Every structure is written in structure tokens, then in C-alpha cells.
A protein has these predicted regions:
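N-linked glycosylation sequons
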Residues: 1-212
């Protein structure tokens, strides 16, 4: 599910759905149709979004009151903190149209084959997070720009900036990071479809139990 709605904090104008999310999701659905059955449900401004029933949720600009717990959640341009998110919003940092480069805080599969230092932002949301829940992957001047949580309670990625105020959508890093996110949060149940007798293989369980 892709939900985009909200107003620009500076101008008060309605923010339109981001074409970059729409395009990269459509491209991934087409390119990896044999690997993932990606069916995109876009919820328009003014319509009611769902908080259950999807494998992957994208909320842009307007955040849900409570995080969905039955799928992966991407919060893009976070402006308010969902109740059960472990996040706190400390305001907007505006660079007055000056762009700054981000830095990688750690290695993570989501950043695989990317060069994070190519990414710039000119405005972002200052976020305080619970370090026991989240890992900061990208930052600027100590402020987190991309946070990830992946545990039994929740699977969440938080982009603390809007794609409208970043060069990320114009870089190869954007589709790579979206692909890596799917690989990281929703790995294949099994790799391969033909095995020899006594050959060992791994089954990835996405639920609480796995029966074979």
C-alpha cells in the first residue's frame, strides 16, 4: 500500500503523491515479477488508508497514528511520530536551499551496491529515536536520515527527509535501496527449487511458526 498526503510545513500547500515512488515500485513489479508478486494499492489524499492486510506499507508526508504490525513499514518524510514507533519529532531543519551530503553510519544490506555519500538533502525532520529499537544507516551532522528497525515486533524504515528536498530520486541509489529493502525485510522463503538427496538448505520463516 502506498499512501501519500499532507501539506508542506513552509508553504501550507498540498503535497502531491511522489511520482518517483510510483515509478520505482512499478519498475520493480515488472522486473521481478518472477520473484515477487508486487501488486500496488495507491490510496489517494482524502481516502482512508489501511493499517493491516498488506505486506509492505509506504506512508509519505502523513503518518499513521499507529504503526501497522503485520507488514514492513516505510515512513517517508516523517512529520509526526506514530504512537508505537519509538520515535520523537524535534522539528524541521531547513538549509535554505543549500544541499548537504549524507554519511553512512554503518554497513547494512539496504545500502548494498550504493554510494550513500552521493545523496544530498536540503531539508529534513530532526528525529530522536530509541537506539535499542533502531539503527541509523545514514546521517548528517549527527542527525539520523535513514533509520531501520528489524525485529520480531516491527519491521520499519524511516526516511527523515522528503524526496522533494533530495537528489536521491535522480540517483541509481534510489531503486537499489528500494530493491535492497525488499530483499532485507522480505527475503525469499527458499533459494532454489531443485535439491539433491541429503543436501542442506534454509527456509526463511516470515511468521511465528514454520511447518514442513
Amino acid at each position: 500500500q502506498y499512501y501519500s498526503a499532507g501539506k508542506d510545513p513552509n508553504t501550507g500547500k498540498e503535497l502531491l503523491p511522489n511520482p518517483f515512488f510510483q515509478e520505482v515500485l512499478a519498475a520493480l513489479a515488472k522486473a521481478y515479477a518472477g520473484k515477487w508478486d508486487i501488486q500496488i494499492t495507491e490510496v489517494k489524499t482524502g481516502s482512508t488508508y489501511a493499517t493491516e492486510g498488506f505486506d509492505f506499507y509506504i506512508f509519505e508526508h502523513t503518518m499513521p497514528e499507529t504503526l501497522p504490525t503485520d507488514g514492513v513499514v516505510l515512513l517517508s518524510d516523517i512529520q509526526t511520530a506514530p504512537k508505537n514507533s519509538g520515535l520523537q519529532i524535534d522539528g524541521i531543519v531547513d538549509m535554505s536551499r543549500k544541499s548537504v551530503f549524507l554519511a553512512a553510519d554503518t554497513t547494512n544490506p539496504i545500502l548494498q551496491n550504493t554510494e550513500p555519500t552521493n545523496i544530498t538533502v536540503s531539508r529534513y525532520t530532526k528525529v530522536t529515536y530509541d537506539a535499542n529499537m533502531y539503527t541509523s544507516l545514514l546521517s548528517y551532522a549527527g542527525d539520523p536520515m535513514l533509520l531501520v528497525r528489524n525485529d520480531s515486533e516491527a519491521k520499519v524504515a524511516v526516511m527523515c527527509f522528503s524526496l522533494h528536498y533530495s537528489n536521491l530520486p535522480t540517483l541509481i541509489e534510489f531503486p537499489l535501496m528500494m530493491y535492497n529493502m525488499l530483499e532485507y525485510f522480505i527475503p525469499a522463503t527458499v533459494k532454489g527449487n531443485s535439491f539433491e538427496t541429503q543436501q542442506k538448505f534454509t527456509l526463511n520463516c516470515r511468521g511465528d511458526k514454520l511447518s514442513v
